[in-house]
Structure formats: C-alpha cells, structure tokens
UniProtKB/Swiss-Prot annotation:
This is Glutamyl-tRNA(Gln) amidotransferase subunit A. One of its GO terms (molecular function) is ATP binding. Coiled coil: none annotated. Allows the formation of correctly charged Gln-tRNA(Gln) through the transamidation of misacylated Glu-tRNA(Gln) in organisms which lack glutaminyl-tRNA synthetase. The reaction takes place in the presence of glutamine and ATP through an activated gamma-phospho-Glu-tRNA(Gln). SUPFAM superfamilies: Amidase signature (AS) enzymes. Belongs to the amidase family. GatA subfamily. The active site is at residues 81, 156, 180.
Amino acid sequence: MTDLTTLDAAELAGKIHSREVSSVEVTQAHLDRIAAVDTEYHAFLHVAGEQALEAAAAVDNSLAGGNEPASALAGVPIALKDIFTTTDMPTTCASKILEGWVAPYDATLTSKLRAAGIPILGKTNLDEFAMGSSTENSAFGPTRNPWDVTRIPGGSGGGSAAALASRQAPLAIGTDTGGSIRQPAAVTATVGTKPTYGTVSRFGLVACASSLDQGGPCGRTVLDTALLHEVIAGHDPRDSTSIDAPVRPVVAAAREGAAGDLRGVKVGVVKELHSDSYQPGVIASFDAAVEQLKALGAEVVEVSCPSFEHALASYYLVLPSEVSSNLARFDAMRYGLRVDEGNMSADQVMAATRAAGFGPEVKRRIMIGTYALSSGYYDAYYGSALKVRTLIARDFDKAYEKVDVLVSPTSPFTPWKLGEKVGDPLAMYLSDLCTLPTNLAGHCAMSVPSGLSADDNLPVGLQIMAPAMADERLYRVGAAYEAARGPIATAV
C-alpha cells in the first residue's frame, strides 16, 4: 500500500471523498509519522491525536451517510501554527509567559478548519510570538530543517514548514508578518502564501504587529496551497481589518496555471531585490526561474522600486512599535504566567513576570518599540517609518501599472547553521530583505520552490508578488512555474 504521508493534499482528498481510504487512516498515518520522526525535527509543540482522530471519524461517518464533503479538503489533516487560539489544546506562542494556556475561544481560522472537516494534528513551533527568522527564539527549543538537521527551518513559522517537508502533515497554517510563511517555505522547499492583508481573519490570532500580521496557507504544491487558501479566506465581522469582498478564485487560477501557458502575463524583476550580496547559488536559481517564466510565454521586464532599499529600516521600527503596544497586555493580572514572591506591588509582579516570561528577542523588540514611540522620538522614528511605508506602497503601485506580478528570490540565503546568527540580530533580519516590502504594503506574495542552490545543495525559493486583491495571479504564475520546473528532490 502507498505510504499515505507521501501523497499531496489534493490526492488525499480525492481518495478520502471516493472512500478509497478513510480520513481516520490518513490522520493515523500522519500521527504515526509524527511519533516516529518529530523527536528529530521538533516541528510540533503539541500533538492532539485523540481530537484529530475524532474529527477524522466524523468526516468518514458523514461521507458514509451519503453527504457531500464539507470542503474540498475535508478529511485531510493539518498542522496549525501555535499562535491561533484553540479551545481543545494549548496556545503558547512558543513563550514561557503563555505556557499551558488554553484559550476560551477558537480563532476564526481554527473554526473555519473545523467547519471544513479538516482534522488538526496539533500546534507547531515558532519563534516566540512570531518574532524571528529561524525558529530558534522558541522558549521550547528550536525546530530543525528536515533537509539538514544542523540548519534552521526558517522563521517564524519553521515548525509548520518543517512538518510539511518531513511529511508529518500534508497541509499547514502559518502567519506572515514580514516573511514568516514565505522564508520558511523557501528554505524547506515547500509552498507558502501571504494572502492580501485583511482577506484572512485575524480574530484569535495572537497579535505581533497588527498592521502586518496575516495568516496564510502552506502546502507541498501550489494547488494544495490554493485549496487551503479558499477554505480560510473570507470576511469576518469580528475582525475590524477584515475586507468584505468575495474570496479570490485561487483554485481556478492554480488549475489554469498548471496548463503551463503564461502568454500575456507581464512579469517584473525588481532591481532592488537582486544583489551581488545575495548568495551566488540563490541568484543563479532565481535567474534560471526567470528564464523558465520567459519560456512559458511571459514577458519579463526589469522594474525599479527605489524605496525598497529602506524597507528593512522601516519594518524594524513599525513592527517593534506595534509589538510594544500589543504585548503590554501580558501584565500577569489576567492570564498566563504570574511571578509573585509575596509582598510585591502590582508593578513589581508585572515586571518580574515579564522578565521571566519573555525571551531575549521579544524583550529587544519591546524596548526598541517603546523607545521609538516615546515622547520626543515618535516623529523621528515611528513617524518617519510610516512615511517610508507609504513610499514603498507607491513604488508597488507604479510597478503594477507596468506588470501583472513581480518576482524576486524569497530569501537572499539558503538555511544557515543553527546558532550561527543567534548573537547577530542584524544578520538574522537581513534574511527578510525580499519579503518585508509586501507586508508593509498589505499586498500578497507566494514562495514556490525553485530547486537547490549549486553552492550547498540546499533549497531556494522563488517569490511571486501581486497587488492587493489579486491573489489569483500568484497561483496562476506559481502553478505554471511549478509544472514547468518539474519534480524536485525532497527532504525525506
């Protein structure tokens, strides 16, 4: 019998819905895989085997009763980043301050997965409160890249990406604040999409930076990712930033793209995201991908977005400022960790709790954000960063007057060794150079595997970017490229 963990989500869905295999069998196969290999990768913080099998059995019983599947992915299990609230398992955000905390409500995204009949295998590891690019900032230990367990799996969503790459889950959910879906996808040879800001509900997503955070789908193929995208997208009145608009036709676009015809599509190569400072193997892989797009019939032109050179500086003022505000809620008074050594004032309890509960990177960003928002510095730092953010959005708008999509490497580097950059925050931040602009503008982007770097035989990703509310363009181009590229090596 075929190892069910080797099949893509779309294949599994077809077999489950035709009752060739059961959802319980598929779910159990992945739970067995987790039990067998996750001690090596540490992709999961919590495994919910009993709940997942109950959800799978409900799907099987419904299908046996002659009912239509609840969704195109009904019965296919998923790994959920541990930053979305769940009532039946802990939500820790990989932080000591929330260790063991169980939320009183499900996130909207969690509810959508349950309603779609998608069993949740468990919660995946991340950088604490989604702050990091390597998943080394987790309070519960780093995740390891299935391609090379001495290397990082990207971040902040390295757990979700590693679960996919190691065949512990056929689907996963991540969040993307500055590249936290796309960069892990690139360095694990998986697919990840940052949807248009406001198209996937943030209700129940523990906030890092509210104007940047966006939940999104992850898979091993473009079609799988599109199928999941349509499940989780949609307006939510409980999220004030949610866009009230129809879900984009991303599945149809992925199927169209797989036919391999990009005639009439204009692709822009961003001059500022193609540098000699990038790893040579990454540039070579990207250049080869661009040639492949040309061969598919796309018209490729170079475009300039000058303000992108300031994206990193802008992002690392906007994000810490919002972090400083959002994480003020962890005050030891309402939920989470409480350090109280007796005879302590409320201020002392709060200070002791935050000192013990937050890790170094979270503290660093809180301090930077508090400083940037302080009296006398607000305009010079935060205000200036917002102006640059506007310029970045304008550069995107000008570019999209000429082209349909933009492309770049997803990350300038392949995955580095665990511990290599922990003591150098700036070196770590540079891995997000190519992904940050999309978040600052609120647009959408995807990372698709583009092969292995000739430098070190490690994965490289092609980033495809599109305007807000044009997510389907990502899937058409991504699926066309994926089909033309053909199969690539897998981690395991």
